[in-house]
Every structure is written in structure tokens, then in C-alpha cells.
Amino acid sequence: MKGLRDFDMETAYEAMRKSATLPGKENLMRPDNDDYMSKGYVPLMEQFDNSVSHALEYYIADYALYTLAKSMGKKEDADLFYKRSMGYKHYYCKEFGTLRPILPDGKFYSPFDPLQGQNFEPSPGFHEGNSWNYTFYVPHDVKGLARLMGGQKKFIDKLQMVFDKGYYDPANEPDIAYPYLFSYFKGKIGRAHV
């Protein structure tokens, strides 16, 4: 939100809202929107679909819609989009400390290898990457993700490990901001990998 208001805000907002709430069969922007709206996540329907990747994009978009709705005084919509934007937590798997695909029955996909998908090989739930390329892809709730991971120290250590083990791959957009995530935490900006 940069405060730009020199256009028809209501029409623009309604178009954005429509793309976020239209059922999947009719929705070219969010083809798997039915499950997303009803379950809060996109389940893995086929071995190499992009369910987690799609959902993460929706969460980020919904957070942007929350911000816009809130600025326009649309409290009910703001509440809806904020709640939806926090759905990334469904995918967090404590066993691996990463995001992990979820099956239609709500259980985690198994067997799971968070490294599957390196070098753009097919990966269940992730587009052109693996779980490590997407686990920190929650730019709208970095501190919330840190809490989910067990706190700031665990978050920082896990993020550092991504660099130390060579899991960081700037060739794919989801982890392109990883080097800067350290700066969200007081006293850690010096660890930013720039």
C-alpha cells in the first residue's frame, strides 16, 4: 500500500475480491480455490502437483487483500482475508521443520523428502523447487513463522542452515528474499547474506 488512490478503488477492489472468492471451476486465477476456501489449504491431488506453491501464493495475495480491505474500512472482508492468509500454518510439519504437502484427508503426504525437487526435478506439492525453497516463503508473517518454528533462535539457525548446506537457490523466486529475512530480528541484520 503506497497510498495510491487516483483510480476507482471500489471497482479495483471488487475485481481483486472476485478473483479471491470465485469458485475454482470458474476461476482462472485460482483454479484450486474450492479446497483453499473450504479447508484453508490446497491438498495434494496428484503426485507432482503444485498444491503448496499455489496455496502460498494465495496466502500472500490474501494478506495484500486484507491490507487493502482494512484501509478501505471493509472490516468483514479484512477479517476473512487475514484469517485465510494465516493458513500457511497448515503445511508446517514439526517432524521436518519445513512445509509439507497435505493430502485430501488432511494428513501429511508420505513418504516425504524435503530435498526432493532440487535442480528443478519434479516434487510433490512444489513448483520448480523443493520444500526448503518454499519453507520461508511467508513474507507477510515472518515473525509468525518464527514462532511456529519454535522461536527466533530456531528460525535463524534453520535459515542459516539453508545457506550452509547449499539449499538456497535464487534461480527460483520463492527463496529469493531469504538473504534478507535475518533483518526482521533485532541484532541479526549482520547475518543477512547480501
Question: What residue ranges belong to the model's regions?
Answer:
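Active-site core of glycosidic bond-cleaving carbohydrate-active enzymes
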Residues: G3-M86, H90-R191
